[in-house]
Amino acid sequence: MPNAVPSATVVKTPLFRPSFWSITVFVLVASGIGIRAYRDLSRPDAWDYWKDQYIAPSMTVSLIDKTYLAGRDQGRRTLAVSGTIGPAASRLLRDRVDEAKLTAGDLILLSSPGGELNQGAIMGEIIRSHGLATAVGTADASGRIKPAYCASACVLVYAGGKPRFGVLGSALGVHRFVTEKPMKDPVADAQRVTGAVLGYMTKMGVSSSVVEAMSETREIRWLAPKDALAMNLITDPLSKP
């Protein structure tokens, strides 16, 4: 009887066998990410920025296909911006403007009590660089704009628009900007902030009288439409002030 043919031995080869170098590279990459995250969070106010950007944004930005500023308006694409201007607000606005592919003449619709001064100025610069218009208000389901208010740092965002529409019933509020952080020389710091705001407003084509109005009070001063128009803060009123 012929000898039985021995069955072949099947050797299972692992799909992947990590090498020393692959493990080393992984550890280095992981540690690099961890170190970078630690460095980011160890900076002053870094946690506030991360929280505002990734965990609980203080501001919402929504795309509206068309809003209508007045009866004869043909409608324009709009980003509705509402809420407090937090540490990551300018990053959020920049991302949303890019995602929406807004073009010159499209609208940024604002409704905000204010917030971070530097973020408000950066947001205004973003708006100006894209040639976007601004208005204060909220939009209903039909795209009709309803009155709202824009105060403090929000006014800097509004100033970035070209043109800046004045919606009947909406309000612009200004006050003296102060910092909550302890300063060695509060007077010098106040002068520095005032100078920076004046330079920004001048660049945006707003009269220096708006900064004078800001300097008069720490409480919100709501500008009458005729005053906002005289300051060139409002450039295109939708009704006679």
Annotate each language-model stretch with its function.
Residues 1-16:
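N-terminal Lys/Arg-rich, disordered targeting/topogenic segments
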Residues 17-39:
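Hydrophobic membrane-insertion alpha-helices, especially the h-region
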Residues 40-63:
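Ser/Thr/Pro/Gly-rich low-complexity linker/stalk segments immediately outside membranes or between
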Residues 53-56, 64-92:
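STAS-typified acidic loop motif
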Residues 78-85, 109-115, 139-148, 179-188, ...:
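Second-shell loop/turn segments in exported
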Residues 85-106:
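A short, well-ordered alpha-helical element
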Residues 119, 128, 132-178:
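Glycine-rich beta-to-alpha active-site loop
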Residues 173-241:
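Charged, glycine-interspersed solvent-exposed loop segments at helix/strand-loop junctions
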